[in-house]
């Protein structure tokens, strides 16, 4: 179980705010990275099916990527406050949806890599090993809960 320090949570918060400052650009970049890392993942997303490239200014894409980053940010807060990420109705639902869409454990490292690369690009020279560690711990702890909910939903 990962616990985040006040400094790490502050780093996640400030970088999350920077990410949110340009949702169209940053969500597009996130999905571009996902498909560069795992081209086969394209068919998991309705808003990417039948498209030769990641669409610009797609509200569904922006909402999906925004939710991934928001849930990871919220996981960081929970780790600071409670020392753990707690499951809730949203994560239970996500587990079920992920199962129905064909998401498997191997997809989680792809998303993590794309998150980290996106945040690194967003913050530029403010990127640090501590920021990397904070986002990694938050995402890993969130992924553990989502995978558990996927197993329960299967």
Swiss-Prot record:
Leghemoglobin that reversibly binds oxygen O(2) through a pentacoordinated heme iron. In root nodules, facilitates the diffusion of oxygen to the bacteroids while preventing the bacterial nitrogenase from being inactivated by buffering dioxygen, nitric oxide and carbon monoxide, and promoting the formation of reactive oxygen species (ROS, e.g. H(2)O(2)). This role is essential for symbiotic nitrogen fixation (SNF). The lineage of its organism: Eukaryota, Viridiplantae, Streptophyta, Embryophyta, Tracheophyta. InterPro entries: Globin, Globin-like_sf, Globin/Proto, Leghaemoglobin-like, Leghaemoglobin_Fe_BS. Its main location: cytoplasm. It comes from the Eukaryota. Heme b binds at residues 46, 67, 98, 101. Belongs to the plant globin family. It is found in: Cytoplasm, Cytosol; Nucleus. GO terms for biological process: nodulation. O2 binds at residue 64. GO terms for molecular function: heme binding; metal ion binding; oxygen binding; oxygen carrier activity. GO terms for cellular component: cytosol; nucleus. Nitrated in effective nodules and particularly in hypoxic conditions; this mechanism may play a protective role in the symbiosis by buffering toxic peroxynitrite NO(2)(-). Nitration level decrease during nodule senescence. Phosphorylation at Ser-46 disrupts the molecular environment of its porphyrin ring oxygen binding pocket, thus leading to a reduced oxygen consumption and to the delivery of oxygen O(2) to symbiosomes. Keywords: Cytoplasm, Heme, Iron, Metal-binding, Nitration, Nitrogen fixation, Nodulation, Nucleus, Oxygen transport, Phosphoprotein, Transport. Accumulates in developing root nodules and present in roots, especially in the upper part. Detected in leaves at low levels. Transmembrane segments: none annotated. Monomer. Residues 3-151 form the Globin domain. The modification Phosphoserine is found at residue 46. The modification Nitrated tyrosine is found at residue 139. This is Leghemoglobin-1.
